[in-house]
C-alpha cells in the first residue's frame, strides 16, 4: 500500500475523544522522569549518554525531575474533565455520586494497602521508637488524606513519601463535580477564577513565609495546573470536531515538538536553583509555565501526525501509563529499601558516595525493573480486580 496515501488517510481522520492515546505517552514521560529523579537521589549516577563520541547530559532533566509532578496533576485534570467535555457532543454524563464511587474504587484500596504495608514495616523496624503521639498522628492523617497539613506527617512520615500526591488528588476529587459543572457552564470565568486563585495563593505564600515547604504544594497553589488540564480536555474535544488534514497534523506536530523543547528549557532553568528554598520557590514560579506547556503538549500531540502520535503511544508507554499509580507509589520506597539492604553488591560501604559506576548502573536498573514489576503485579493483581469487584457489588446492590 502506498505509504503517502496511508499518511493522508490517517491525517484526515478525526482524533478519538474517548481515549486520548498520546496522553499515555505524556503520563509515562512525566512519571519516569519523576522516578528517575528519586532513584538518582539514592544512586548519584550522573545521567549522561555518549553517542558517536559526543556526550549528552541529562543532568538538568533529572536534577529537576520533581517538577514533572505538575504534569501528572495536569493530566488528572485533563482525564477527569474529558467525559464532561464530551457532553457537548451528546454523550451522557455521570452523577457526582457515580464519580466519587469510581474514584474511590480505583484509588482508596491501593492507598490503604500501601499504608498497611508501610505501617507494618515501620512497626517491625521500630521507626517510631517511643513516639506514640507521632505514630497516631502519622497514621490518622494518612487515613484521612490530611498528612499535608502538618510538617512532620508530610516530610517525616514513615508511611511513604509519595502518598502526598494522592492526598492532593483526593482533595481535588472532592471539589471536582462542582468545578466541572461551573467550568461547563462558565468556562472562561471558572478558568480565570481557578488560575487567579492559584496565582494569588502562590504570591501570598512567597511573601508571607520564610520557609514555604508546608505550603507550596497545597491545593490552592495547584488550581491553575488543574484548570489548564480541564481546559486542554475541552479544547481537544472541540478541536477533534473540526476538519482534519495534513496541514493540521503538521502544525500540531510542530507545536508538540516546540512544547517538549520548551519543557526542557524550563527544566534546565529549575535545575539551576542553588538551595532547597530556591528549588521550592522556583517550582512555584514555574508552575504556570509547566501547566501551559503541558496543556499545549496534550492537545497538540493528540492532533499531531502519525509518527508523533505513535512515538507517544506505543506498547511501552501504554504499559507504563497503565501501571503508573502503583509505580509512582512504590518506586521511591523500593529504591530506599534496595539501598539499605545492600541488595546490589559493591566493594564500597557507600558505593553511591564513592562513585562506583558499575554499582550505580546496576542499582538504577534494578530500581526501575523491580518497581515496574511490582507495579504491574499490584495493578493487575490487586488494583483493577478490587475496583471491578467494588463497582460490580455496587451495581448489584443498586439492582436489588
What are these regions (language model features)?
Residues 170-198, 233-253:
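Solvent-exposed interhelical
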Residues 18-21, 57-69, 154-168, 207-228, ...:
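Interfacial loop-to-helix transition and helix-capping segments at the boundaries
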Residues 21-86, 107-111, 142-147, 151, ...:
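Functionally critical transmembrane alpha-helices in membrane proteins and complexes, commonly lining
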Residues 32-39, 120, 148, 194-206, ...:
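Aromatic-anchored segments of alpha-helical transmembrane domains
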Residues 66, 226, 230, 253-384:
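Alpha-helical transmembrane segments of multi-pass integral membrane proteins
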Residues 78-86, 114, 118, 172, ...:
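Hydrophobic transmembrane alpha-helices
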Residues 23, 66-69, 84-123, 133-141, ...:
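Transmembrane alpha-helical segments and their boundary/interface "anchor" motifs
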Residues 1-20:
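Short, Lys/Arg-rich, polar N-terminal cytosolic tail immediately upstream
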